[in-house]
From Swiss-Prot:
The keyword ATP-binding applies. PANTHER family: BIFUNCTIONAL PROTEIN HLDE. It comes from Geobacter sulfurreducens (strain ATCC 51573 / DSM 12127 / PCA). The gene is hldE. Keywords: ATP-binding, Carbohydrate metabolism, Kinase, Multifunctional enzyme, Nucleotide-binding, Nucleotidyltransferase, Transferase. Residues 1-330 are annotated as: Ribokinase. ATP binds at N205, R206, K207, E208. One of its GO terms (molecular function) is ATP binding. This is Bifunctional protein HldE. Pfam families: CTP_transf_like, PfkB. Catalyzes the ADP transfer from ATP to D-glycero-beta-D-manno-heptose 1-phosphate, yielding ADP-D-glycero-beta-D-manno-heptose. Homodimer. InterPro entries: Bifunc_HldE, Carboh/pur_kinase_PfkB_CS, Cyt_trans-like, PfkB_dom, RfaE_dom_I, RfaE_dom_II, Ribokinase-like, Rossmann-like_a/b/a_fold. The keyword Nuclease does not apply. It catalyses: D-glycero-beta-D-manno-heptose 7-phosphate + ATP = D-glycero-beta-D-manno-heptose 1,7-bisphosphate + ADP + H(+); D-glycero-beta-D-manno-heptose 1-phosphate + ATP + H(+) = ADP-D-glycero-beta-D-manno-heptose + diphosphate.
Length: 490
């Protein structure tokens, strides 16, 4: 899949309305140091230094979709307890529609507590209900689907065998979706895949595929037999088997098989990687992407996810950046404004502080680099607005720039301190600032606050302006004069 198509998918993610149905849970992480053995028993003692609560299970799928820029609704059942309240508040805070979540006082909201030291899990403690939700709760979810379901572009089913996804509810959801040609993407659990019959695509891992097919996967031949059996058992259009360090394999009706190698650079934790695969594949299908390209995109996202500890989300920037890593593209950071606006919106949804600066950057020198490094220190990512060739000619005369905009953008994108480069053709970056709405606007020390274009815009929504001093004696003009003095007569 070409990068421009991936960028277009993310740029239009806001048009995708996704419904996530499944088992919700809280993931609690206790981080600490394990440097002692207990005198009471031969076990490690963990001195807890930090605690964190994240949304897990189907909730992590929803969080991933939000991070990708989609509109998201969730249908599920939680207990009438503190953990259920935490989940509902967390979703609402992210703009996730919780109308389809049923509160049942007789149930316990799932909470998994993981104890970690040196980024490794030591023990996990579970508190949860595993009983089926019952006919009344099934009917309430189906009623929600009948009332609101026509607005969804895709339905993602996240099954953790905690009782929400009963055979009755699954049959109702799949029948509803098939009637309306809405794709249903399922992350399955258990060995009975007949309950998912009629879904569009399933995404089991290798161990799950073995259990469901009854075939031990030892080589490509046994893998293909397992895939074909599951396609038939569940009457699927497609099947994606994730294979850890071996990537994933896509099976389509008619015997077509596509093997996709992994792109994970380093694996810290596989927790939640399946949620990321489900979210990205579902988003891709909703956005009109085919199964093969959707699986490749999900594979890239999974490679990013396993490089993080615990349940986490993956941003469009990380996915596009990984595509650039795979393809060896040095200009993966260079975006047009439409694409960049979608990416930045998703980054902000994850709480990232965006810094913006702009300039010509003709003949890059150490003063530029130090300035950009300082600008990057004010936030989590730096966007550079780069004056186009035409813009520079209007500002500095027909002899400038010395280096064209494509080369300048490529050179600047190679700097670690720069996350994105966007070329603009106007005389000022005001349109960029109004569109991207950075938290911090940075300009050189030769400006006064009153002279900074976009200052009023940034300050109007609580942002700020930072002025950074230049390195004395370092400028493009000085370099040009030095070259002319040394070589002008030759």
């Amino acid at each position: 899949m070409e990068r421009k198509n991936v960028e277009s998918l993310f740029a239009h993610a806001g048009a995708i309305n996704a419904l996530v149905i499944g088992d919700l849970m809280l993931d609690q992480y206790l981080w600490g140091k394990a440097e002692r053995i207990s005198p009471e028993a031969p076990v490690q003692v963990v001195d807890v230094t930090r605690e964190e609560i994240r949304i897990g299970g189907a909730g992590n799928v929803a969080n991933n979709l939000v991070a990708l820029g989609c509109r998201v609704s969730v249908a599920s059942v939680v207990g009438g307890d503190e953990n259920g309240t935490i989940l509902l508040h967390a979703f609402s805070g992210k703009g996730i529609d919780v109308t389809g979540i049923v509160e049942d006082p007789s149930r316990t909201t799932s909470r998994k507590t993981r104890v970690l030291a040196s980024n490794q899990q030591i023990v996990r403690i579970d508190r949860e209900s595993r009983d089926e939700i019952g006919p009344d709760n099934e009917r309430r979810i189906v009623d929600y689907l009948n009332a609101h379901g026509d607005r969804f572009n895709v339905i993602l089913v996240s099954d953790y065998l905690k009782g929400v996804l009963t055979p009755t509810l699954l049959a109702e959801v799949i029948a509803f979706a098939r009637k309306r040609e809405i794709p249903v993407v399922v992350d399955p659990k258990g060995s009975d895949y007949a309950k998912y019959r009629g879904a569009t695509v399933l995404t089991p891992n290798r161990k799950e595929a073995e259990a469901a097919s009854g075939i031990a996967i030892r080589d490509d031949e046994s893998l293909c037999r397992a895939g074909e059996r599951l396609l038939e058992t569940a009457d699927l259009t497609a099947l994606v088997i994730t294979r850890s360090e071996e990537g994933m394999s896509l099976f389509l009706r008619g015997g077509q098989v596509v093997h996709i190698p992994t792109y994970a650079r380093e694996v810290f934790d596989v927790t939640g990687a399946g949620d990321t695969v489900l979210a990205v594949l579902g988003m891709a299908l909703a956005g009109g992407v085919g199964f093969a390209d959707g699986a490749r995109l999900a594979n890239v996202a999974a490679g990013v996810a396993v490089g993080k500890v615990g349940t986490s989300t993956v941003s469009p920037a990380e996915i596009v950046g990984s595509l650039g890593f795979q393809h060896g593209e040095g200009d993966a950071k260079v975006k047009n404004l439409d694409v960049l606006a979608g990416i930045i919106a998703a980054e902000k949804a994850q709480g990232k502080r965006v810094v913006f600066t702009n300039g010509c950057f003709d003949l890059l020198h150490v003063g530029h680099v130090k300035y950009l490094q300082k600008a990057r220190s004010f936030g989590d990512l730096l966007v550079l607005g780069l004056n186009s060739d035409a813009s520079i000619r209007r500002l500095k005369g027909e002899k400038r720039p010395l280096i064209g905009q494509e080369e300048r953008a490529h050179i600047l994108a190679a700097l670690d301190c720069i996350d994105y480069v966007v070329v603009f053709d106007e005389d000022t970056p005001l349109n960029l600032i109004e569109t991207l709405r950075p938290a911090v606007l940075v300009k050189g020390g030769d400006y006064t606050l009153d002279g900074v274009v976009g200052r009023e815009v940034v300050e109007s929504y609580g942002g700020r302006v930072e002025l950074v001093a230049f390195v004395d004696g370092r400028s493009t003009t000085n370099i040009i004069e030095k070259i002319l003095k040394a070589y002008g007569e030759e």
